[in-house]
Amino acid sequence: PSLDAALWRKLCWNVPFNGLSIAGGGISCDAILADPSLMNRARVLMEEIRSAARKAGHPIEDSFLDRQFEVTATMGAYQPSSLIDFLDGRPVEVDAIWGEPLLRGRRLGVEMPTLEKLNTEIRQALKQRG
């Protein structure tokens, strides 16, 4: 697969799990999986990323998305790297993980309302953190 295809696949995990851990107030992956509404939101975020990837010529199959949840379930109380950066007061890669995929999706004509909301929530959390 091309580098672009690999990046879209990586975003299928990074966007929801890094993002919801910050937007959820500093929660680990197991807490996301334990909350039906957060788990659903994670799936919707993955679907939005997949739609943009498909429009960009990089189809991602359902089984790949399913596998993201299966692997994450084995991680326990894992804290994604962006959450650790957020909690430690370090810079968070907001543009690379949430901003750029949103921008690319828009350019491709893909509606990504859940990602747009998450992007806003993360930026607000960073402002509040100071």
Predicted regions and their residues:
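Active-site-proximal catalytic alpha-helix in oxidoreductases
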Residues: D4-C29, S37-R50, A77
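NAD(P)-dependent Rossmann-like dehydrogenase/reductase catalytic/cofactor-binding core
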Residues: A31, M39-G130
